[in-house]
Amino acid sequence: MIHFTKMHGLGNDFMVVDGVTQNVFFSPEQIRRLADRNFGIGFDQLLLVEPPYDPDLDFHYRIFNADGSEVEQCGNGARCFARFVRNKGLTQKNKIRVSTNSGKITLRIERDGNVTVNMGVPVIEPSQIPFKAKKSEKTYLLQTPMQTYLCGAISMGNPHCVIQVEDVQTVNVDEIGSSLTRHERFPKGVNVGFMQVINPGHIKLRVYERGAAETLACGTGACAAAAVGQLQDKLDKQVRVDLPGGSLIINWEGEGKPLWMTGPAEHVYDGQIQL
């Protein structure tokens, strides 16, 4: 039997598994079955806690999408990861350092129960996103057979395309997101964010996630939108990001500096399942 915990960050929901005290392995087929909301547990991503590969770190953090693919980063998941390892007694620290498949991040559990995550330095160099472009720009033209989009491209450990829209409520997220998530200029696919600027300190955002379609919240998407908006001189250093599932606070001092995300992480229930 595998013991697991169901958690969510702003409605972005996770199956979290302790791979430190349990010997676990999940095949892509098993993950797809577990992710099914009718026949399985149901989740956007599976989060796996592993022992650290680096003695200076506390844990290794792995993320699997509902389609079974492993991805580099998940911001909402990172907050749940921090609460999970504390709740399960895997650490007593309030400041937790973990490695991911894209680098190292620091998680800080706040007194009010929210979690602040040092998401690292946003990557704007196209080849490192990865994104096919001759040079780094604040805005790119992205062509599809149906339409041309103005977008920002950035990586928060995973690739993001951010498009500014007049009204996030009326945009066809599924249609546009599905057409862009596999765009040829993003060799590893891309998460597509639709950003409505309310004022320089406040945006609304919907995100079509690579491998998961639209979710109620995307932490890295919120970070990407705030960073792109700041690079385009549209947003302040601190931005409130309203997602369908709730709000996040993003702080960024600018290019070359780490970006910080603060938001909730909620425990739903503990369970066990036979694979």
From Swiss-Prot:
Binding residue positions for substrate: N12, Q45, N65, G75, N76, N158, N191, E209, R210, G219, T220
Subcellular location(s) per record: Cytoplasm
Active site, renumbered: C74, C218
InterPro entries for this protein: DAP_epimerase_AS, DAP_epimerase_DapF
Recorded GO MF terms: diaminopimelate epimerase activity
Catalysed reactions, as listed in the record: (2S,6S)-2,6-diaminopimelate = meso-2,6-diaminopimelate
Site residues by UniProt (Could be important to modulate the pK values of the two catalytic cysteine residues): H160, E209
Enzyme Commission code: 5.1.1.7
SUPFAM superfamilies assigned: Diaminopimelate epimerase-like (SSF54506)
Alphabetical keyword list: Amino-acid biosynthesis, Cytoplasm, Isomerase, Lysine biosynthesis
Site (Important for dimerization): Y269
Pathway: Amino-acid biosynthesis; L-lysine biosynthesis via DAP pathway; DL-2,6-diaminopimelate from LL-2,6-diaminopimelate: step 1/1
An individual GO BP term: lysine biosynthetic process via diaminopimelate
GO cellular component, one term: cytosol
Domain of life: Bacteria
Assembly description: Homodimer.
Family designation: Belongs to the diaminopimelate epimerase family.
PANTHER family: DIAMINOPIMELATE EPIMERASE (PTHR31689:SF0), DIAMINOPIMELATE EPIMERASE, CHLOROPLASTIC (PTHR31689)
The protein's role, per its UniProt record: Catalyzes the stereoinversion of LL-2,6-diaminopimelate (L,L-DAP) to meso-diaminopimelate (meso-DAP), a precursor of L-lysine and an essential component of the bacterial peptidoglycan.
Record-given protein name: Diaminopimelate epimerase
Gene: dapF
